[in-house]
Amino acid sequence: MTVRNIASICNMGTNASALEKDIGPEQFPINEHYFGLVNFGNTCYCNSVLQALYFCRPFRENVLAYKVQQKKKENLLTCLADLFHSIATQKKKVGVIPPKKFISRLRKENDLFDNYMQQDAHEFLNYLLNTVADILQEERKQEKQNGRLKNNGTAIATDTEPEQNKIDPTWVHEIFQGTLTNETRCLNCETVSSKDEDFLDLSVDVEQNTSITHCLRDFSNTETLCSEYKYYCEMCCSKQEAQKRMRVKKLPMILALHLKRFKYMEQLHRYTKLSYRVVFPLELRLFNTSGDAVNLDRMYDLVAVVVHCGSGPNRGHYITIVKSHGFWLLFDDDIVEKIDAQAIEEFYGLTSDISKNSESGYILFYQSRE
């Protein structure tokens, strides 16, 4: 255990008692726990995402429900379930937990994370959600195959076998998956073709002094395909000028928005951070939806923000702010603090292009209202 980890545990009592005092005994939510996570050497990218996901209630509830199922072989999901269960069943309301088992499993499963370097929180989120979904789908596939076997081990032939081989969406998809529709209109024959594409999170470009609504509008701006970028129209049987646009067709239960704050600079031969000020509201409604979108009036509430602190992707630090039972908390590895809602503005970014460290919202989690 490192000196930093020992110090984390030594400071646990001080931080915990201060947090309980800030929240107040009468206001402290029943059956809720606020636990920091020990940093095992530049694992703040992991800690910040885990805290955000823990406070996405539908995700937490499904992970905890997975924990109570029959004993399974260790994988990333079982380790995640053990960690969430450990937090949720603590006798104390606040404190610090070392996610050692989860980090060890993560490093075993993916070489990208098997080091002590700073990693990208968005890459980790993407990897985690896809891995959990893959594990669930593989388990369901095995269950279906086992269900088609007779007691003597021979397969039962059924007319519905192709249907049984079809992979159903998992609870990861039910929570985070939305659908984009890519519409292309030929400017010669006016034929519109569309192609759907599923997503677990949306990555949007950022500009200086804008808002999330502006970023999403830009994401869905109409683009003209001309010159060498002409579109091959099936109806015209030739390349034609066309207009292309992206719309949201299916709105997810939880919308994860990734702000593309790291840009490769050719002259520097490296990625640099765009610390632009991008306002993210506490409430969000999407306006870049397709005409046939389901629940197009869905209102979202901000529940968590992964914040990048520093000047570049491979240096700096990640923290998380979450909303829990009407108030806001800041998780900085082992430290947990209650913050005012007004303090969220500090994480919008910088109003000027001055090259200095900034604390900027990087991944936003919006949960839809019932």
UniProtKB/Swiss-Prot annotation:
The keyword Zinc applies. It catalyses: Thiol-dependent hydrolysis of ester, thioester, amide, peptide and isopeptide bonds formed by the C-terminal Gly of ubiquitin (a 76-residue protein attached to proteins as an intracellular targeting signal). It comes from the Eukaryota. Residues 35-369 form the USP domain. Disulfide bonds: none annotated. PANTHER family: UBIQUITIN CARBOXYL-TERMINAL HYDROLASE, UBIQUITIN CARBOXYL-TERMINAL HYDROLASE 46. This is Ubiquitin carboxyl-terminal hydrolase 46.
